[in-house]
């Protein structure tokens, strides 16, 4: 969030979702996440399903929070899909390559999907803002 602090955001970024290069209704959004080990988004959910497939590296996909938290680790070409409303996050957990980015393919259903961070994710954002201001 912070920009406007809206609880609902586009998974593709505010600017990208507002001005698409090709204005069509394809029914899905496809993108890549590139990051180093230990990095990934905070826990969130979407109003549509979301599918992940690692291209390189090892990625941990988590769902639910607290005592209900579960996860699975995926390697290249493994696939996992989360239903609408299920809290989820992913993180690069590749070992021995701390300075190397890895790639995760992300497919989000729908023409205008929305994302919502969980309450615990917002607590982490507030903690970060407090310690970095």
Question: Positions of the model-derived regions?
Answer:
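Double-stranded beta-helix
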Residues: 87-133
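Conserved hydrophobic/aromatic beta-strand scaffold that supports enzyme active sites
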Residues: 30-34, 51, 71, 79-81, ...
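Short histidine-centered beta-strand/loop micro-motifs
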Residues: 19-23, 41-46, 63, 71-73, ...
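Short beta-strand segments in beta-sandwich/barrel cores
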Residues: 31, 40-42, 50, 57-63
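Conserved short histidine dyad/triad with adjacent acidic residue
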Residues: 10-18, 29-46, 84
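Short acidic-glycine-tyrosine-enriched beta hairpin
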Residues: 25, 49, 53, 65-84
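A short, N-terminal "cap"/entry segment at the start of jelly-roll beta-barrel domains
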Residues: 1-27, 133
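Histidine-centered metal-chelating micro-motifs
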Residues: 39-42, 60, 78-80, 84-90
């Amino acid at each position: 969030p912070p920009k406007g602090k809206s609880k609902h955001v586009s998974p593709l970024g505010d600017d990208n979702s507002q001005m698409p290069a090709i204005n069509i209704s394809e029914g899905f959004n496809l993108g890549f996440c590139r990051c180093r080990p230990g990095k990934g988004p905070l826990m969130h959910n979407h109003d549509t399903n979301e599918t992940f497939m690692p291209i390189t590296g090892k990625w941990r996909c988590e769902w639910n929070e607290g005592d209900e938290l579960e996860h699975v680790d995926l390697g290249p070409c493994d696939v996992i899909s989360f239903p609408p409303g299920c809290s989820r996050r992913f993180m690069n957990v590749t070992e021995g390559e701390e300075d190397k980015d890895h790639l995760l393919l992300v497919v989000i259903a729908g023409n205008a999907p929305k994302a919502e961070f969980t309450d615990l994710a917002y607590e982490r954002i507030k903690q970060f803002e407090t310690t970095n201001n």
